[in-house]
Regions:
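N-terminal subdomain of nucleotide-sugar transferases
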Residues: 1-65, 200, 206, 273, ...
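Acidic donor-binding loop of glycosyltransferase active sites
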Residues: 199, 325-340
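Conserved donor-binding/catalytic core segment of Leloir-type glycosyltransferases
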Residues: 242-261, 267-270, 422
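Membrane-proximal helix-turn-helix segments that form the acceptor-binding/catalytic region
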Residues: 23-24, 111, 122, 144-147, ...
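A short, active-site helix/loop in glycosyltransferases that binds the activated sugar's phosphate group
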Residues: 194-222, 426
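A conserved catalytic-core segment of Leloir-type glycosyltransferases
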Residues: 40-118
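Carbohydrate-associated surface elements
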Residues: 207, 228-229
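Nucleotide-activated donor-binding/catalytic signature segment of Leloir-type glycosyltransferases, i.e.
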Residues: 283, 287-320
Length: 431
């Protein structure tokens, strides 16, 4: 099959959509399919390129801030390994973000990727004339990707179109997408148009399917749940030396998205742990791998007791993440406040076989449901962080230090989430 994937960013950007769809695209290439990716421009990279057999077409800007980056030829940027850590955010970056927050964010539609819409649509329609595609997948967020897909579908109604919803759009009120006072009705009309035109729709969790059925009655019959992906081809960096021997390493891998996922509850819990159980102070090392925005950084500074134990690594290459996961003693997961999102790293956490400490912020909790009967999972409610939760954590750390599931147990649990199974599920939806 000849396939077109429309998503805002591709390599070298590091985010869940890139991880997921790069693994799927390379798997399809290995199977003999022809895969094209339409994404946004990036200074220093050609608009047309081939990576791992995937034909990449770049058009338009990812965001207003990225437009500034490209204009000024800035190569160290957010969302990429080696991008600035919070302490390095200069006056120019902070000024640009403030300008975006005050003016741009209150007006743009449908989302912060709207600068991509017109050039992306133009490029996509040109690709449709050049290549007779057998199927097309648009990946959102951002919703802008689906609007480009909708234009392609209207141009060629015979083209099979799969709408992949990693994050919902119109009904989301837990975090900012656009100015709902201005655009709420337009948001629902636009998403309804996309859902009605799509040949197939994918979401990552059952609760998302149920929520879509509530807001768009009848659409759930066209929705398939395709869960998070584990990429078995990812190899840990052999030169990883980020962990001090003889210590208890607790690692959080991923980003924060205020207000639905913040580090506050985890920091409060760990601060209480060192207060009530000072025996952990000399050995406990707390690692955060992932981009930490300047506004989120303030939460870490509220707990001076933790500072000697904290290690903020920033955004690193996936090989470094894999090495950290392989070498850590415990994994930390911080749940979303929403009930219709499942963190993409859930499959990676499951595949690690490591003990997991989870802070639950919603009911139902999609991560708890995903981990099911995991024998080394400690789940604590964020609203109940106190002495009892702290003592449970201390016991868990003592009981499960250096424990790991067997290779057989890991394989049995992770098999449905391997790249091959996920890629095949998408292909079936395009048949």
């Amino acid at each position: 099959m000849r396939l077109l994937i429309i998503l805002a960013q591709y390599h070298p950007a590091l985010n869940p959509n890139v991880y997921r769809w790069r693994a799927i695209a390379t798997h399809w290439i290995a199977q003999g399919h022809e895969v094209h990716v339409l994404c946004t421009k990036r200074s220093g990279l050609p608009d047309e390129a081939v990576l791992e057999g995937v034909q990449i077409h770049r058009a338009g800007q990812n965001s207003l801030l990225d437009w500034f980056y490209n204009l000024l030829y800035i190569t160290r940027r957010r969302g990429e390994a080696g991008g600035d850590l919070p302490s390095r955010h200069g006056a120019l970056r902070k000024g640009l973000e403030k300008l975006v927050d005050i003016g741009w964010r209150s007006l743009y539609w449908p989302d912060g990727r709207c600068l991509w819409h017109r050039p992306g649509k133009k490029r996509a329609l040109h690709l449709l004339k050049t290549y007779p595609f057998d199927g097309m997948i648009s990946v959102g967020a951002p919703f802008t990707a689906h609007l480009i897909g909708l234009a392609c579908k209207r141009s060629d109604k015979r083209l099979k179109w799969l709408v992949d919803i990693e994050d919902p759009f119109a009904f989301v009120d837990a975090y900012f997408i656009n100015n709902r006072l201005l655009y709420r009705r337009l948001n629902f009309r636009a998403e309804a148009a996309v859902l009605e035109a799509a040949d197939a729709i994918a979401v990552t969790v059952d609760t998302a399917k149920e929520t879509y059925g509530h807001y768009f009655p009848g659409i759930e019959t066209n929705v398939t749940v395709v869960p998070p992906l584990f990429d078995p081809t990812l190899v840990a960096a052999p030169d990883f030396d980020g962990f001090e021997p003889g210590c208890i390493h607790l690692s959080y891998l991923g980003a924060f998205y205020a207000p639905i996922r913040t580090p506050d509850a985890a920091l409060k819990l760990l601060n209480l742990l060192l207060e009530r159980h000072p025996e952990f102070q000399p050995r406990l090392r707390i690692h955060f791998f992932g981009e930490i925005e300047y506004a989120v950084k303030a939460a870490f500074e509220q707990y001076p007791r933790l500072l000697p134990n904290l290690h903020l690594h920033g955004l690193v290459e996936r090989e470094q993440v894999a090495a950290a996961m392989a070498n850590t003693t415990f994994l930390l997961n911080i749940g979303n406040t929403t009930t219709y999102n499942l963190p993409s790293k859930s499959a990676d956490y499951l595949a690690s076989g490591k003990p997991v400490i989870h802070l639950s912020a919603s009911e139902p909790d999609t991560f708890v449901a995903f981990m099911a009967d995991h024998p080394m999972l400690l789940s604590l409610k964020t609203e109940a962080i106190g002495a009892e939760a702290t003592d449970l954590l201390a016991k868990f750390l003592a009981d499960f230090e250096n424990r790991q599931l067997s290779a057989e147990a890991i394989e049995a649990r992770i098999k449905p989430y391997r790249a091959a199974q996920i890629a095949e599920a998408y292909l079936r939806m395009l048949e």
